[in-house]
Structures are given as C-alpha cells and as structure tokens.
Design a protein with these regions (language model features):
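A short, N-terminal "cap"/entry segment at the start of jelly-roll beta-barrel domains
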Residues: 1-35
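Conserved short histidine dyad/triad with adjacent acidic residue
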Residues: 35-51
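Surface-exposed loop/turn positions
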Residues: 43-45, 79, 87, 95
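Short glycine/proline-enriched turns and hinge-like loops at secondary-structure junctions
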Residues: 50-52, 93-94
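Glycine- and acidic-residue-biased ligand/ion/polar-headgroup-sensing regions
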Residues: 52-64, 69
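Short acidic-glycine-tyrosine-enriched beta hairpin
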Residues: 70-86
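Ligand-binding loop in jelly-roll beta-barrel domains
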Residues: 85-110
C-alpha cells in the first residue's frame, strides 16, 4: 500500500456545501484521517457547526469576514483560522478558501440551528 495520496483540487468535481462550492480531496469511506477542501464562497455562507470536526481555513483569495460564535473576524489572503467542534461559523464575502478537515469530513456532521 502506498503511504501517500495525490489530488489535483482544481480537477476535482465541485459539490454544493453551506459555504458555496467545495472540491474535496481524499473524501472516501476508507479515509478517516483528514480531508482537504478548496471552497469557493460566492455569497454569504449559512451558519453551521460540527460536533466532531476541526477545520482550519486558509484564505487564498478575496476579503471578507468569518463569523465565529457571533464574533466577526476580518480576513484576507493568508489569514488562517482554526475552527474547533461546536463553534458556529460562516464566511461573509466572496472568497476562495483552503480547508483542512480533521478527522476526515463527514456530511452527517453538519448541523444548523
């Protein structure tokens, strides 16, 4: 078994998500460790949270805000934010974000108030 995996995020099919469109690398049932997402936020995202997942956002393009438990944080390229389980969050503004998710993304762990 190979001890590495390779993905080309710009060639990965986009899927709708609460933040806009997400291209998900390493998203498969046998992978429980981590996933990497390229997220294009074209409008204000829907507030949501995760009970198990920790997300780390790296802003690649655009400027705007991340709302984290009701606090509005200004972000710009290379701003990096770790979002722990239970933190209600959403992006506000048009941005491209690299999102590292640990453990691997689980669509059943997206919660809305």
């Amino acid at each position: 078994m190979q001890r590495y995996e390779f993905a080309q995020l710009d060639s990965t099919a986009g899927v709708p998500c609460p933040c806009g469109t997400s291209r998900r690398a390493f998203f498969k049932p046998e992978n429980v460790l981590a996933t990497t997402h390229l997220v294009e936020i074209s409008a204000d995202a829907r507030t949501h949270y995760h009970k198990r997942l920790t997300e780390t956002y790296v802003i690649l393009e655009g400027e705007g805000f991340l709302e984290l438990d009701g606090e509005r944080i200004p972000v710009k390229p290379l701003s990096t934010i770790m979002i722990r389980p239970g933190c209600r969050h959403r992006a506000v503004g048009k941005m491209k974000v690299l999102n590292f998710v640990v453990p691997a993304f689980d669509p059943e762990d997206e919660w809305f108030d």
